[in-house]
Amino acid sequence: LDDQGELFIWLLASILLVRTALTFFMVPYLALGAEITDDYHERSRLAGMRTNLGWFIGIMASAMALMFLFNEENGVDGRFVIDNYCTYGWINGFLVIIFSVICIAGTWHYIPKLASGAAHVGNNMLGELMSTFRNKNFRYLVILDMALGGIGGITATLLMVTYTYFWKLNATETSVLFAGPVVAAVIIVAVCSGYLNRVFEKQQLLRLTCLLTIINLLWLTPLKLLGLLPDNSTLVFILIYANWAIQVMMSILRMIATQSLLADIVDEHELATGKRQEGVMFAAAFFSAKFISGFGYLVAGPFLDLIGLEAGVQPGDVSRTVLWGLGLIMGPGLALIMLVPMWMSFKVNMSHAGQLAVRQALTERAIRSDSS
């Protein structure tokens, strides 16, 4: 499409359709985690397996595309060839269908095994949604997820741009950074998550990951902006690799803690109201995060215009304004936004002992209900 207006309409419609389809799939997918098991640690292990696989497969797809589809041919950088993105879209669409069918077939037998409270069906969707926000812990986690969604939207939009123009990496180096740190992070989390779950409670792990993420965002890009790093050296590449590996590791651990805490909040809400609303709760949390992540994408585009990054410009030809803009938003800027999740993580008031007490009370209620 040559017309900017038509291109905007097409992109907007495509994003809305993709997000809608993703929501219809992800809400029951996430909510089912609260029904498969009611064990405190088992929920963390389940969320860990799901999150690790999601990160690993998602990033490997991008890395493989950079290596084999967007690689340099005849002196032309494949990232700047429009036709490559069409092929990339078709391949991803085919893979989404395959893995969705596998997921649906693998979890189908859990549908009849819902908790007894799940049988409640409300006739006022808005009322059901608002009732979930009476739970303070749920409100805090939703706000936390919304802030993280904004950070995710900005990062997803500007990460490739930052690698290309701020760090001046080629396609091969970028593909290594897309895959390598994620693989390292997934392996470390898979090996250490059991130990971390025994040492830390979920809310403690949530606070720790928020704090370490802020620290990790504040050291690398400022060093580059202040001229304290050599240009295009092996050392710089290793530092970028380590920085992104830490970032991904903290993100995975935080997602595991958040999803597992949401499953516990479903129990807490059921005890308080007599209604089991895991679908509504996970839908509200997921929609809020994705809604704000959309604003992250909206912010990133005008931001690139603001700092003066022109379409098609080569990495070595950008101005210092572009470099400073990218460095500030992808480092201190994101750290500033991370203060919101950090604040919310300290307001969450949950514990292992509290969850055991909730499960015990629910069991006793179910026994009394069956006996009557």
Describe each PLM feature range.
Residues 1-372:
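Membrane-embedded alpha-helical bundles of multi-pass transporters/translocases
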